[in-house]
């Protein structure tokens, strides 16, 4: 589990909009887990890691 989110690693994702996940590794996303990822990011399920001081994450950049 990410300490900043209710997402379980490799689990399904239903994070709230206020979620501050730093490393979302959900296999399915009902919405974006990372604030830096767009909701429709098709690669979110592949393991999104938000970059510090950036509005983009490693999978959707």
UniProtKB/Swiss-Prot annotation:
A biological process from GO: intracellular zinc ion homeostasis
Binding sites annotated in the UniProt record for a divalent metal cation 4: 33-34, 44, 48
Listed GO CC annotations: cytoplasm; nucleus
Phosphoserine PTM positions: 58
Residues binding a divalent metal cation 5, per UniProt: 34, 36-37, 50
Binding, a divalent metal cation 6: 37, 41, 44, 60
Entry binding sites for a divalent metal cation 2: 7, 13, 15, 26
Family of this protein: Belongs to the metallothionein superfamily. Type 1 family.
Protein role: Metallothioneins have a high content of cysteine residues that bind various heavy metals; these proteins are transcriptionally regulated by both heavy metals and glucocorticoids.
Record protein name field: Metallothionein-2
Gene name for this UniProt entry: MT2
């Amino acid at each position: 589990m990410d300490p900043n989110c209710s997402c379980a690693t490799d689990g399904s994702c239903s994070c709230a909009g206020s979620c501050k996940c730093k490393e979302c590794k959900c296999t399915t996303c009902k919405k974006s887990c990372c604030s830096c990822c767009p909701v429709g990011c098709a690669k979110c399920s592949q393991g999104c890691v938000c970059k510090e001081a950036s509005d983009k994450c490693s999978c959707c950049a």
